[in-house]
C-alpha cells in the first residue's frame, strides 16, 4: 500500500526497512504480513 515496510528477522534482531523496489519477484511486487522471505541487508540512502 505504502510502497515500503519492515521485515522482522527470525533471529530477533532489529526490524529491517524494505522498499518495494528491492523485492525481486516477477509481476506485482508485494509482500504479505507473515510471509517468509530471504533477504540480504544492504546500506542505502535514507
UniProtKB/Swiss-Prot annotation:
Domain of life: Bacteria
Protein location: Cytoplasm
UniProt induction comment: In response to low temperature.
Keywords: Activator, Cytoplasm, DNA-binding, Stress response, Transcription, Transcription regulation
Gene Ontology cellular-component terms listed: cytosol
Limits of the CSD domain: 1-46
MF terms in GO: DNA binding
This protein's record includes keyword Cytoplasm: yes
Gene3D superfamilies found in the cross-reference section: Nucleic acid-binding proteins
One Pfam family matching this protein: CSD
Subunit structure: Homodimer.
Protein name stated in the entry: Major cold-shock protein
Organism field: Aeromonas hydrophila
Protein encoded by which gene: cspA
